[in-house]
């Protein structure tokens, strides 16, 4: 269970339920990043996280058999899975152990798997398997619509991700030893093409401000070289993966997010909980649902920026509009303060106490 949005949600759910239920966590790989209550029963299927995509695909039936053995041994009648490969394994294993399958899709498959052979294989598997699940949980309205329209998934509900707002607030007050020289933007996310950190770096090169980037990933080396190439090492810092990113959020002045596509970007809620004004691309899906909940969820910006109730939305892959939004946030203190005042109000809509009841009705009650 590495660092990531889905993994964080699993940790929140289990830690919240362990006082009421006997909780079991079955991992494909033995890695655990998030803190889990010691009372949670953890087992893993002993898979190698460094396997190639091809090997992971070929081993799906074998891993499904391993899961079915655990299910039969523990006499589980229902298994909940998070993330695409785990969903495949859950559904395939149910043919052997006959348990009910609840799968959770955390991204928009038609966009996430839109390239190459790997994308075609995953689209095929989603179309072939997902509709056979007892229930599919999407974490945004955009994801739900994508699964309905493009993958013929019928038994489907949408439940947003839960957040422990009090814990985030508490962690945000922890001391960190980092120097802040001027107006500072911050972004958090895996260093991959989808998060499009280069767009933020390109935007900030002509702005009198600093940028903190929290996260790790395959593009770390490329981004380090790109920052040096643009001679921005004095204003752009790659801070790596942080166990407590909230203390960095609380020190920054504005959160900026440049993803090309998302499922439900947890970092936007976390930034709201830290009372940060937000600039985000209007990617599918999640940012509009979070920052502009009263607008048409099917609309997507093309040529303009949009000042919403809870932040600024900009078109995807548009460096000029992103730079305009960043300059506006620096120059307009009244606008920044207005977003800050509204942020915690919006974050509270995703409180764990509220969202967990929706999960509990589906997962914990027969």
Language model features: what each stretch is:
Residues 7-12, 183, 187-206, 218-224:
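A conserved mid-protein helix/loop that constitutes part of the nucleotide-sugar donor-binding site
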Residues 58-63, 100, 109-132:
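Nucleotide-sugar donor phosphate/pyrophosphate-binding loop at the beta->alpha transition
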Residues 1-4, 8-59, 143-150, 158:
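N-terminal strand-loop element at the rim of the active site
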Residues 328, 335-349:
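A short, well-ordered alpha-helix in the C-terminal region of glycosyltransferases
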Residues 43, 127, 131-170:
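Donor nucleotide-sugar binding/catalytic pocket of nucleotide-sugar-dependent glycosyltransferases
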Residues 292-319, 329-333:
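Conserved acidic donor-binding segment of nucleotide-sugar-dependent glycosyltransferases
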Residues 81-87, 105:
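Short His-centered aromatic/hydrophobic patch
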Residues 241, 260:
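Aromatic "clamp/platform" in nucleotide-sugar-dependent glycosyltransferases that forms part
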């Amino acid at each position: 269970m590495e660092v990531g949005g889905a993994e964080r949600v699993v940790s929140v759910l289990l830690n919240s339920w362990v006082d009421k239920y006997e909780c079991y966590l079955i991992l494909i790989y033995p890695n655990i990043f998030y803190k889990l209550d010691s009372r949670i029963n953890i087992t893993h299927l002993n898979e190698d996280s460094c396997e190639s995509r091809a090997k992971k695909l070929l081993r799906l039936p074998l891993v499904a058999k391993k899961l079915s053995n655990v299910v039969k041994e523990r006499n589980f009648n229902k298994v909940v899975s998070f993330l695409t490969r785990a969903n495949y394994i859950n559904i395939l294993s149910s043919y052997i152990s006959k348990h009910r399958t609840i799968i959770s899709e955390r991204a928009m498959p038609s966009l996430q798997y839109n390239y190459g052979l790997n994308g075609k294989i995953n689209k095929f598997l989603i179309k072939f398997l997902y509709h056979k699940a007892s229930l599919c949980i999407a974490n945004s309205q955009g994801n739900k619509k994508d699964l309905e329209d493009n993958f013929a998934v019928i038994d489907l509900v949408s439940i947003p991700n839960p957040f422990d707002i009090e814990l985030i607030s508490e962690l945000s007050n922890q001391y960190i030893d980092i120097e802040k020289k001027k107006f500072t933007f911050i972004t958090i996310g895996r260093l991959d093409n989808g998060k499009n950190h280069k767009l933020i770096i390109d935007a900030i090169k002509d702005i009198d401000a600093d940028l903190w980037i929290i996260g790790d990933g395959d593009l770390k080396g490329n981004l380090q070289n790109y920052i040096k190439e643009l001679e921005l090492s004095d204003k752009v810092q790659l801070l790596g993966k942080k166990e407590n990113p909230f203390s960095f959020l609380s020190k920054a002045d504005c959160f900026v997010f440049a993803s090309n596509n998302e499922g439900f970007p947890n970092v936007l809620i976390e930034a709201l909980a830290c009372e940060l004004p937000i600039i985000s691309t209007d990617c599918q899906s999640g940012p509009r649902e979070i920052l502009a909940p009263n607008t048409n969820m099917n609309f997507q910006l093309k040529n303009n920026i949009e000042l919403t109730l809870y932040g600024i939305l900009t078109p995807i892959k548009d460096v000029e509009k992103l730079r305009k939004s960043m300059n506006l946030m620096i120059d307009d203190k009244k606008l920044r303060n207005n977003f800050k005042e509204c942020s915690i109000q919006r974050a509270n809509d995703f409180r764990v106490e509220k969202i967990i009841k929706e999960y509990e009705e589906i997962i914990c009650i027969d």
